[in-house]
Amino acid sequence: MRVLLWGTYDTGKPRARILCKGMRAAGIEVEEIHARVWEGVEDKSQVTGLVGRMRLLARWAFAYPRLTWRLARAPKPDLLLIGYPGVLDAFVATFVGRLRKIPVAWDVFISLYDTIVEDRKMIRPNGIAARLLHGLERRALRRVDIAFMDTQAHARRIERLFDLPPRSCGAVWVGIE
């Protein structure tokens, strides 16, 4: 089996490294196409101010054309895997994945909406920003073929939060390095 880990996933956190190591240990061939959008950003919820947000937006704007081109030209994998955080990656990956008939899986790991709105209360739950974030994440979850979190409890919570079909979200434990 060949898996292509694709996108702007955060290499500063161990999650992607652990998944790759586990897949390789299981005999799965793993290739990577990655853009370092999150380099130097430890806590994504702390990207504040116009300059910080514009810098991140510019990184994305420059990353996606190259990522998309490389994905379109890469040898066809059996599975296209999007790493955490991946909300925007899901839209691009599923577009190309559908054209190339490649199933897309997303390691959601942590819901952005749940973290920013419900847990940290950084924006009002009924505000327009919260509604936009909820809608964006819900649409991303519905586009991918497979979504998974770090635990079954989180998977069930995401299903309820985003009105997904029961048992539609799986779980893969984080593990240790």
Predicted regions and their residues:
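N-terminal subdomain of nucleotide-sugar transferases
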Residues: 1-41
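Short beta-strand scaffold positions
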Residues: 82, 149-150
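A short, charged, and often flexible helix/loop element on the N-terminal side
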Residues: 37-70, 121-128
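Carbohydrate-associated surface elements
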Residues: 153, 175
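Membrane-proximal helix-turn-helix segments that form the acceptor-binding/catalytic region
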Residues: 68-69, 95-99, 127-147
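Short acidic/histidine-rich motifs immediately flanking catalytic phosphotransfer sites
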Residues: 74-80
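An aromatic- and histidine-rich active-site surface loop
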Residues: 80-116
